[in-house]
């Protein structure tokens, strides 16, 4: 009956929705939120309690930085039964689509997925342990980190990460608007600026 979709959901999927279904946009982009998260949570509960069949369409996996946990918690507390259809996380699917392996037996035997925009700073100080992250030999994947790229880069180098470490910045992966910039930890901020990649 209703599809509540977000910014990262593929528009081609919306073309498959029944003609009589209601489409509600609940997207978030950087600091521009069409609906605040609590409003999305309340909307999902309201629609379900009205007896409507509701699809919450998200890009990637809803439980990996997708706020699916928050939405599911709200539905559970309201007594609403729901089903999760796991998605394929952009943390590994987008690099693969771009030809960048996140693991390789000669270079990286692990990968680590990290938020690129923390919502839980303590007095303006990052709660991420950049000292530990800088020592990791595996691939570091920062999701939604473009706006904070200069801070991420500086924090890693200040804590000992080799400035020659290869870096890729991937934007809107697997879509017609996909952008890829590659460089090193030392120059990736300049490369991204030169390529005109912005949030």
Place the predicted regions along the sequence by residue.
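Class I S-adenosyl-L-methionine
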Residues: 1-88, 93, 189
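A contiguous loop/helix-start segment that scaffolds small-molecule binding in enzyme catalytic cores
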Residues: 2, 39, 49-54, 110, ...
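Short hydrophobic/aromatic-enriched beta-strand-loop microsegments
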Residues: 3, 21-28, 81-83, 102-109, ...
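Short secondary-structure boundary/capping segments
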Residues: 14-15, 46, 103-104, 131-132, ...
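Acidic/glycine-enriched edge-of-secondary-structure segments
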Residues: 22-36, 107-117, 141
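Class I SAM-dependent methyltransferase SAM-binding "motif I" and its flanking Rossmann-like core
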Residues: 59-136, 179-182, 186
């Amino acid at each position: 009956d209703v599809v509540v979709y977000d910014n990262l959901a593929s528009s081609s999927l919306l073309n498959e929705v029944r003609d009589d279904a209601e489409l509600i946009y609940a997207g978030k982009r950087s600091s521009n939120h069409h609906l605040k998260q609590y409003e999305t949570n309340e909307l999902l509960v309201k629609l379900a309690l009205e007896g409507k069949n509701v699809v919450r369409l998200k890009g990637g996996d809803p439980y990996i930085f997708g706020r699916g946990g928050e939405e599911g918690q709200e539905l559970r507390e309201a007594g609403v039964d729901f089903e999760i259809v796991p998605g394929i996380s952009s943390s590994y699917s987008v690099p693969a689509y771009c030809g960048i392996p996140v693991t390789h037996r000669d270079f990286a035997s692990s990968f680590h997925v990290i938020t690129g925009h923390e919502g839980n700073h303590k007095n303006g100080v990052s709660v991420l342990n950049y000292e530990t992250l800088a020592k990791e030999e595996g691939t570091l994947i920062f999701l939604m980190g473009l706006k904070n790229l200069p801070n991420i880069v500086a924090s890693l180098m200040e804590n000992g990460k080799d400035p020659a470490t290869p870096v890729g910045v991937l934007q809107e992966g697997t879509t017609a608007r996909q952008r890829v910039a590659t460089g090193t930890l030392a120059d990736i901020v300049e490369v991204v600026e030169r390529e005109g990649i912005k949030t």
